């Protein structure tokens, strides 16, 4: 079927991709502007089948409680907590939106998507223990990190983390920053609930439909070309606003849109693999998200973690990540993704990163060369008695790190997310990876503020119902923080008192 004969339909909003970002934006728009029509196109046959799938996530529930890359050490030995506070502030916004969703019926059964799990930072060696003590000293007095503990006694370590203690040589000092109030989030389950609400309230979701092109019209609207991957039928959709929440596929579509704001951006794909525990007895001996410290010179994405996941109400355990490399921008993408993303406007950025990120290149080479025995040996830093027969290697989702123009360098690699939008607010997209899904709500509120400045003011009362702290830094208003924390904990059923230590089985 030719494009000329394609069926044409009209909609107010097109969401590209059925992942957590599109689902969040759609759920917000259905509440603040219920008269707008919303159409979602997903190239695969299921919701959240790429990066939002729980086994494809590199990490979940990111709130900077345990991730050491958010708390770098200064030259004088002190620890900078700026990034950690910023990430935690964003996660509090997401928690509030989810709690409001449960209260209002947008979401149901919070246990299906969020569960209390301690977040733990783990190091060994005297110098690293000293750093972790300095990190604790910097964070423990901050209202968003209240309740954090510093643990360096072997007997307490053993009580809380029995799987990690068995066979460990405690003559090498160990230290933990332990936060009881952490969470595990199944973003696949959450995405399904949010998109279920969008569909039930009048939105339309098309699976097996791939957006192939975006063309701006003189009236400011967009012609969106879509192909049904099952039968090859093409259709044309006219939309007043387009959000490209296509994960690794977002860069290509933003490039096709031709907007000036997307020029100069590139993407560097990194695939991830994890060891997933297959022994229920071992899974029952560990209930925590334990994050270590990346090796000197290794990128932030390489931070090792032994991670409890709760998926379908069942506990799971994984360790990683082990980096891999593929030119695909999506797990189910194409090998031409990377080469076809190189354009005249981002060529210098891409080449600049090739020169400036030699450390990343070396890291990837070493990871690709690692044997199965080498992976188990790495795991033994966390689980000294680990045996290969108890673990299986799984491939996680593709992460496409943002490459951005930089004066004098050509381009720099950024380990975060970036909202890209046209100046007229008719199209926006999200690029990048970590912290990703955990900050979906503040990211989508940012999209609304950028793209709908006139409507945003009239939407504010409704948005403040969803997020009571909207526009307020909770760090600066401890009374409000206490109020929303108690509220979200109750509504989301996050009773951490029942999680006495990591040896308690789920």
Curated annotation (Swiss-Prot):
Its EC number is 1.1.5.4. It is an enzyme of class 1 (oxidoreductase). The keyword Flavoprotein applies. Pathway: Carbohydrate metabolism; tricarboxylic acid cycle; oxaloacetate from (S)-malate (quinone route): step 1/1. Its cofactor is FAD. One of its GO terms (molecular function) is 2-hydroxyglutarate dehydrogenase activity. The keyword DNA-binding does not apply. It catalyses: (S)-malate + a quinone = a quinol + oxaloacetate. Keywords: FAD, Flavoprotein, Oxidoreductase, Tricarboxylic acid cycle. One of its GO terms (biological process) is tricarboxylic acid cycle. InterPro entries: FAD/NAD-bd_sf, MQO. Belongs to the MQO family. PANTHER family: L-2-HYDROXYGLUTARATE DEHYDROGENASE, MITOCHONDRIAL. This is Probable malate:quinone oxidoreductase. It comes from Rhodococcus jostii (strain RHA1).
